[in-house]
Amino acid sequence: MKNIFIKLIAVFALLIFVLCGINQGETEAASKSANQDLIIINKHYNKLAYFHNGQIEIMEPVATGKTWEKTPVGFFKVVNKIKNRPYYNGNIPGGDSRNPLGKRWLGLNAKGTDGDIYGIHGNNNENSIGKYVSQGCVRMHNADVEKLYDQVQVGTPVAITYSYKSFVDLTKVYNYTLKDN
């Protein structure tokens, strides 16, 4: 009985160590980009902020998942960039005005995917922006996502959250250092 108790304590301690290491890794990843880039998407306000070299460069409205679980919360990276990506489910070619993905796609490695399931993209329904309507992606106005696409590099960290905090306060959560104006 004593051996079982000791093994349980060891497993519990290992579990705590592993979980703390995962969170520390996310914080360190954000910290390494502290003077470079960070995208924060706040599902509470349905807004996206892009920070570059300690300054906010872009802040725009977005659309996110129609239910809580559709757009994953967490810390991810941009893993691919595609102009005029086809909409495979509807067999709609890239560049077609019917394409719900719009003109630009920034693929995210959310939920262990390789950037082909979750992304930040344009749309074919400008009235959807600011609402909870997507199947999990983050939609932007086409002009806004084109501007973001031109500035963001593959590897840019992306934090998706649901928070009442301001973007300035959220940069502190992700250890991103803002420059004084």
Say what each PLM segment does.
Residues 23-80, 84-85, 103-109, 173-176:
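Cell wall/extracellular polymer interaction/catalysis modules
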Residues 30-34, 82-181:
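Exported/periplasmic cell-wall-interacting domains
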Residues 2-26:
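Sec-dependent N-terminal signal peptides of Gram-positive bacterial secreted proteins and lipoproteins
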